[in-house]
Amino acid sequence: MTSVPPELIPVVVVGALGRMGAEVIKAVHLASDCELVGAVDTTPGKEGVEIGEELGIGVLDVALTSDIEACLCSVSQSFHRTGPGQGAVLVDFTHPSVVYEHTRAAFAYGVHPVIGTTGLSHQQLVDLSEFAAKASMGGAVIPNFSVGMVLLQQAAAAAARFYDNAELTELHHNRKADAPSGTCIKTAEMMEELGKSFNSPEVDEHESLTGSRGGLRASGLRLHSLRLPGLVAHQEVMFGAPGESYTLRHDTIDRSAYMPGVLLTVRKVRQLQGLVYGLERLI
C-alpha cells in the first residue's frame, strides 16, 4: 500500500463506483490534506482496476477491490491508530443491507467510519454507538452532508414550536433503495423534540388507495416519498395554519453539493469520541 505523509488523512471509499462514491474519490483527490488509500466496490468485472483511471481522473495507484475485510486489514496495518487524531477514515456510500456490517468492521479494524448510506434502524444505531464506545473511537453517521439541508432542518424544528400541522415530502432519484429517506426521518425527529403532537384529525379519513396519505409517525407527522428519474435529492416541509401556509424547501441539483460536508466530516471524525449522528453536530 502507498505510504502517506503523516500530515495527510488516509481515506478508504466504499461504494467507489457509485455516483456518490465516485464524487467522494474526486473530492479526496483534490483535497490537499487527504489521500485515497483504498477503494471498494462489488461491481462485477472491475476487480483490480486502477480506480483513478476508471473514473477518468488520472492514476491514483489504488486498485479497486471487492473485499472490504481485506482492504480494512491492510489499511489498519499500514495506518495503525494509536490515539486520537490518528488512523484511517472509511467513507461508505453503499446500500442499507450492508452498511451496518461495514461500519462494525471499520470499528473492529480501528478505521474511523463516516457513513453516508441511510437506512440504519434505531437499534442498529444504538449498537454502533456501543461499538464506538468500546473501541474508544470516533465515527459519524450523516443522513445528509448538505449544509443547506442542515439549515432547513433547524428552521423546521424552530417552526414546529408555532405550527400544529405539518407534513414532509422527500423526492429522490429512482435508484434510492430506502424510503422515507434518512434525511426526512431526521427532520421529523428534530421537529418532534418538543414532544408535541401534530395534525389532529378534523375528519375521519379514509384511503381508497392504501398509502395515499403517506407514512404516519407516532407524533402525527406524515412523511411522503417520491422516486423519479431526473431527480437528485429534494425535501419540502409544509406547515399549515388558518389563513396561511409556510413552506421550507431544499434542492440538491448536483452531488458536488455534498462534498464540503463530506470533507468536513473526514477531517473531524478522528477527533471525535463515540458515534455522532447528523452533520449539525459537527458545524
Curated annotation (Swiss-Prot):
Record keywords, A-Z: Amino-acid biosynthesis, Cytoplasm, Diaminopimelate biosynthesis, Lysine biosynthesis, NAD, NADP, Oxidoreductase
NAD is among the record's keywords: yes
InterPro entries with a match to the protein in the record: DapB_C, DapB_N, DapB_N_CS, DHDPR_bac, NAD(P)-bd_dom_sf
Pathway the protein contributes to: Amino-acid biosynthesis; L-lysine biosynthesis via DAP pathway; (S)-tetrahydrodipicolinate from L-aspartate: step 4/4
Cellular localization per UniProt: Cytoplasm
Protein family membership: Belongs to the DapB family.
Protein name: 4-hydroxy-tetrahydrodipicolinate reductase
Lineage: Bacteria, Bacillati, Cyanobacteriota, Cyanophyceae, Synechococcales
